[in-house]
Amino acid sequence: MFILHATILTVFPEMFPGTLGYSLAGQALHKNIWSYDVINIRDFGLTKHKNVDDEAYGGGDGLIMRPDVLGSSIDHALSLNPNAEIYYPSPRGRVFTQSFAKEMLKNKNLIFLCGRYEGIDERVIEEYNVKEISVGDYILSGGEIPTLTILDCLIRLLPGVLMNQNTLSSESFEEVGEFKGGLECGLYTRPEIWRDRAVPSVLLSGNHRLINEWKKEQSRIITKLRRPELLKDL
């Protein structure tokens, strides 16, 4: 029985599962830890050309995805996934973070509405209480890549996906564990010396207390240099 189910609305259904069919996410998909279905918005398009967009009222550049077309596709998605939360990747949405990912997983049924063109009609957001979600302060061509990104993060958090679930607590942005919401320290493996660069001696000492102290201090230094706004919570 799957733990997470995602319904994806898109005009490019062939983009899924995409990268989610590989590595950890792909293995979890085959194990039925998560599942998905894709709905082609064009199946609900108008005229023989299956149009899904139209010109914007009030002028402006770009075309807008029509509310009647999106409404029909969302209604169909809700018939398959009735208790789902609906998310719309959008640059004006709440910024996606590790803590937001955990919050999203309180509902194991999710619908992702992948916009295209200039965006979607605002009335769709109002009608279905759609939650807008942003993956950063930049613009992409559509919502498919953000959806893949968000799902990859969510899937890693599901029980049974990682061989060692404790790995999560030692990663960047985790609120519990070694780095307390900061950035992860540098990582090292064999060989011990590479191009005259040596592994820090403390990591070879076998002294777990000193190693943990070193990791925490390195995390603090890296976080201060690269993401100082995270330190307020450390």
UniProtKB/Swiss-Prot annotation:
Catalytic activity: guanosine(37) in tRNA + S-adenosyl-L-methionine = N(1)-methylguanosine(37) in tRNA + S-adenosyl-L-homocysteine + H(+)
Major localization class: cytoplasm
Subcellular location(s) of the protein: Cytoplasm
GO molecular function, one term: tRNA (guanine(37)-N1)-methyltransferase activity
SUPFAM superfamilies tied to this protein: alpha/beta knot
Pfam families, A to Z: tRNA_m1G_MT
GO CC annotations on file: cytosol
Binding site for S-adenosyl-L-methionine: 115, 135-140
Sorted UniProt keywords: Cytoplasm, Methyltransferase, S-adenosyl-L-methionine, Transferase, tRNA processing
Family: Belongs to the RNA methyltransferase TrmD family.
Function: Specifically methylates guanosine-37 in various tRNAs.
Complex and partners: Homodimer.
The protein's name: tRNA (guanine-N(1)-)-methyltransferase
Species of provenance: Rickettsia felis (strain ATCC VR-1525 / URRWXCal2)
